[in-house]
Amino acid sequence: LSEPRVNAAGPSQGVRAPSGGSDPHAVGKRGGHIRVLIVKLSSLGDVVHAMPAVQDLRAELPGVHIDWVVERAFAPLVTRCEGVGQVIPCELRRWRKHPFASQTRTEWRAFKAALQAQAYDAVIDLQGLTKSALVAWLARTSTDGRRFAMANQTEGSGYEAPTRWVADEAIALEPHVHAVQRSRLLCAAVFGYSVTGPARFGLVPGLLAAHVPVQPGHSGYGGNGFAARKPRVALVHGTSRADKQWPLSSWVELGQRLNHSGFSVALAHGTPAEKATSEAIAAELDDAWVWPSMGLDALTDTMAHCAGVIGVDSGLSHIAVALGLPHVQIYNFDTAWRTGPLATDPAADKAVQQVSVFATPQPSPQAVWQAWESLDTPVLCR
């Protein structure tokens, strides 16, 4: 493979938007309609952080068709992202564990067929890893189509060289950049537009359906068994890294403050250990509900009906941000600048809805509570 062209973030030499003085050659052959493939496979938080790039593309390229390749576990979330046409699920994590199994070979062939069913004018690798480079390389491009990727690593993010080897054009980004802005800037460089305005995620939850859990002993309003009689705040304590956790005693103190202030507490979990923690917290509270195990789709839809979310740096907390919920994100490390809620523009004259709290070894319950009280007043569950 030849070394790709490397550009700084800015107008790319590849596919261009059909307006604003840009080169329309690549899109003219398609009647002004561009087909874009986003490659962002995992993890949960990273997938959420890529969603605003889709909304930018829709705003800048009317009529654009956007497909997205993602790990199957996160596909239910991407299907709720406005503007995504086809979600192409893969299971690279599982396939790598059993590469020669008959089931793996069958599923791999089916995945390749789905991936190559359409030709794309732009294949954009937003992941920057070998596995995403492989997917981008396998994707089919149109006659004038090109593959794009990051030319360099950004602070705190994984990056592997094959992503730039596979790309027709690798785009250099500033190393100190928020995860949301990184994806937005890369897509903007591909099509020659500027990133403006706050990030819009376009995450639209589904309606509460019959499979969404009902709290025992609560009939709710209007026949909807989930709807709370008072505002409910979800606490997200689970995380894949032990050093991101918050002490159990701190969760209990926070939950007691919420109960005393008139909030009900909901506790999410994804593993047996997290469920045990949820039950331990709930046992110390007057009004708490440990949610049953749910798929990502039901969990997203259920969380959307809460008055707010307080959680550690985890995928569920990032979903809360994308849903636009009042949210406090807890950090034991000074990395909120990279993955936490983006700061509100002081000139926008808007009430603050989402903040992060950082301290070492961890923020105190008082600091988190003060952050919660500083937010715009939570509304009752819908």
Q: What do these predicted regions represent?
A:
Residues 1-382:
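Catalytic machinery of carbohydrate-active enzymes
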